Amino acid sequence: MAWGWWKRKRRWWWRKRWTRGRLRRRWPRRSRRRPRRRRVRRRRRWRRGRPRRRLYRRGRRYRRKRKRAKITIRQWQPAMTRRCFIRGHMPALICGWGAYASNYTSHLEDKIVKGPYGGGHATFRFSLQVLCEEHLKHHNYWTRSNQDLELALYYGATIKFYRSPDTDFIVTYQRKSPLGGNILTAPSLHPAEAMLSKNKILIPSLQTKPKGKKTVKVNIPPPTLFVHKWYFQKDICDLTLFNLNVVAADLRFPFCSPQTDNVCITFQVLAAEYNNFLSTTLGTTNESTFIENFLKVAFPDDKPRHSNILNTFRTEGCMSHPQLQKFKPPNTGPGENKYFFTPDGLWGDPIYIYNNGVQQQTAQQIREKIKKNMENYYAKIVEENTIITKGSKAHCHLTGIFSPPFLNIGRVAREFPGLYTDVVYNPWTDKGKGNKIWLDSLTKSDNIYDPRQSILLMADMPLYIMLNGYIDWAKKERNNWGLATQYRLLLTCPYTFPRLYVETNPNYGYVPYSESFGAGQMPDKNPYVPITWRGKWYPHILHQEAVINDIVISGPFTPKDTKPVMQLNMKYSFRFTWGGNPISTQIVKDPCTQPTFEIPGGGNIPRRIQVINPKVLGPSYSFRSFDLRRDMFSGSSLKRVSEQQETSEFLFSGGKRPRIDLPKYVPPEEDFNIQERQQREQRPWTSESESEAEAQEETQAGSVREQLQQQLQEQFQLRRGLKCLFEQLVRTQQGVHVDPCLV
């Protein structure tokens, strides 16, 4: 054939599709524009017939510029900018054994002589003011000084956690508003809840994960509502950059410790006899009647066997003046026909009433001896009333109604308890529904929840989650740091044995107490009781913290091993840029009078960067380049700087809450209502008729001078408020205001 020598049609060689590719750079440098591919137009070839000629002249085509979805707003830089890195180390968490239910940041500045320090979870709040205070404590260093540079740009932070040898940790951070805390913040940080969170950072110990890096690095961008522009450092010094939450956990043995064979815990609650005798002010009755009424309930006449509540190893030592006698067995023994003596404490017999079946003393005589012991013990307290507050006879340490003879668990027979109830709690049966916890004042006489008197109710969550950090948050919520000695905790839980729940009255609460309180010891199990406590021995939060800690630790993923301390160390690095328009200063000193050192160029004092408090940075505190007029400072600048008064920080003792601790979040509308209520109380804007009527009701005998001074103070208060409002308005017009949700 004629075409036999032709080769057969073969496939085209495969080649990669053309792409722009990625710009590979070995060293970071300024990015360049990607090359634009030339657009190729292919001519269409007609398969049939001759191509037709165009009958008109085609115009030039233009590409219309696409409309941008957003524009970039540029801001002119100040005359001088300095990049600054703030680097330092700090403990992210320190927890002594027995303080796991507490918040570490709330107890960061505690002065503890003896006992556990810190807490099992931490809620940090970082700001520029906090970093400045850490620098004053020599905990960090700044690569650039902010002196005379009042502007700032924030770029973010980097945190590096160093893994602990034997403790795991769970870390979360928050950069979305609102950046404050609420009553559910601490319960959400329980390890059982933290493990269920979506954005968590696990920091395993070296035992849990022997291999891998020894550090965990986290990059945290600026807050979501934070606009990237120049701010005055004075305006953002107390701005929350981010919140950091840390909690200690156990990822190796999350449910049961290898040191025990049981997940249940046991604690004690007050018996029903105390329900109407909980008030420390004794109610409306006098002290003698109050004691008699309680003893009649504890030792009724018609129930002689009920006096076995005194069958403890502490009764004879406490009720000793006069001595409360018990049955003494004869030396001859019980006899041939008996194995035990007739009154035997091992069988729950009332050993303080009967002796060989004969009643030696009545319940009335026992009540009189106990009351006499209270009076004799209280007499010594009255003698020392110059150095201590008296308290009351009913609340004496060794003889009161909450003394060891009534509440001590060291009994002859545990089946016959005192005025308490042993409760067993299993966290795996707790579904949360029906659980309640709240706080009652020590002046409240009963154990029933009352919305008008009880505070901080939490309900329908597992008990070990609700109690986590509950006391520390109550101090923030009430702004009362002495709350631990002024309130008591009550709870209801239908998942215990026996059930701490009354079907007919769900508001019926139970008062738990620690084992050391029942034994007459301090919360740290110290047998010595201070003098100021000997007339005020009643259950409050300090005597309940041990029970709260045990319930919280019983939950999943909590560290249950007995360790003296658990700690997590971290290193942080914040990225800022300082800016401003400082004046050029040139200080010339006589070179002949300069000091000398052993080595030229060196010294025994290390050089440090001078850091200025951001609160005192601004145009009102220093001179700027625009203040110079003909090489001299202008009169307005001199007046502006001279009006600022220097206040020493040592004049004030400081706040009771550390600045780095997470504060309570106050909604804007609630904050406005509080301010309005305060303004209404101060009465700066009331009408003349209202002010005159209130003035007549408050004081009619006041002099004209006092009224004028009061009006002058109100005018000063009004002036300060208007000045603050005007400053905020000016910041808003200048565009340097901060989002209120970030403050």
UniProtKB/Swiss-Prot annotation:
Residues 665-706 are annotated as: Disordered. It comes from Torque teno virus (isolate Human/China/CT39F/2001). Belongs to the anelloviridae capsid protein family. It is found in: Virion. The keyword Ribonucleoprotein does not apply. Keywords: Capsid protein, T=1 icosahedral capsid protein, Virion. Self assemble to form an icosahedral capsid. GO terms for cellular component: T=1 icosahedral viral capsid. This is Capsid protein. InterPro entries: TTvirus_Unk.
